[in-house]
């Protein structure tokens, strides 16, 4: 697991010595990397009594177009500024451009955190 604690190096490059051991709440998880496929979800215990629903894969998006929100089917990922390799792997992240049955749309939600894909239809599609 990834350590989300502070860096082991100072600003100058010198080593910082550990004051305490790594704690469980400082650990992170691997990213969900939501793909375009049949819907699959994972429930994760969050801090407190909360739960997070991660979308491991989905093919449905809530697409908004001038106030109207419709449920559209995702066909594939057209562009993803987070990582160029995500395009050919069909991974959906916030800011990705997806091809839907209504046209191209930009993802506004974080599917790995919220478990759903919300998007805004692009003008030029």
UniProtKB/Swiss-Prot annotation:
It comes from Haloquadratum walsbyi (strain DSM 16790 / HBSQ001). Keywords: Ribonucleoprotein, Ribosomal protein. This is Small ribosomal subunit protein eS8. Residues 1-36 are annotated as: Disordered. Coiled coil: none annotated. The gene is rps8e. One of its GO terms (cellular component) is ribosome. Part of the 30S ribosomal subunit. HAMAP family: Ribosomal_eS8. Pfam families: Ribosomal_S8e. One of its GO terms (biological process) is translation. The keyword Nucleotide-binding does not apply. Gene3D superfamilies: 2.40.10.310. GO terms for molecular function: structural constituent of ribosome. Residues 7-26 have a biased composition (Basic residues). Residues 27-36 have a biased composition (Basic and acidic residues). Disulfide bonds: none annotated. PANTHER family: 40S RIBOSOMAL PROTEIN S8. Belongs to the eukaryotic ribosomal protein eS8 family.
């Amino acid at each position: 697991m990834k350590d989300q604690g502070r860096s082991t190096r100072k600003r100058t490059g010198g080593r910082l010595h550990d004051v305490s051991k790594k704690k469980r709440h400082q650990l992170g998880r691997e990213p969900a990397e939501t793909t375009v496929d049949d819907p699959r979800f994972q429930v994760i215990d969050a801090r407190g009594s909360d739960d997070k629903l991660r979308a491991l894969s989905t093919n449905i998006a809530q697409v908004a177009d001038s106030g109207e929100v419709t449920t559209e089917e995702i066909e594939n990922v057209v562009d993803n500024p987070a990582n160029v390799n995500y395009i050919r792997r069909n991974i959906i992240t916030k800011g990705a451009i997806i091809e839907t049955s209504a046209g191209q749309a930009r993802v506004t939600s974080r599917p790995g955190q919220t478990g759903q894909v919300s998007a805004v239809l692009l003008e030029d599609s």
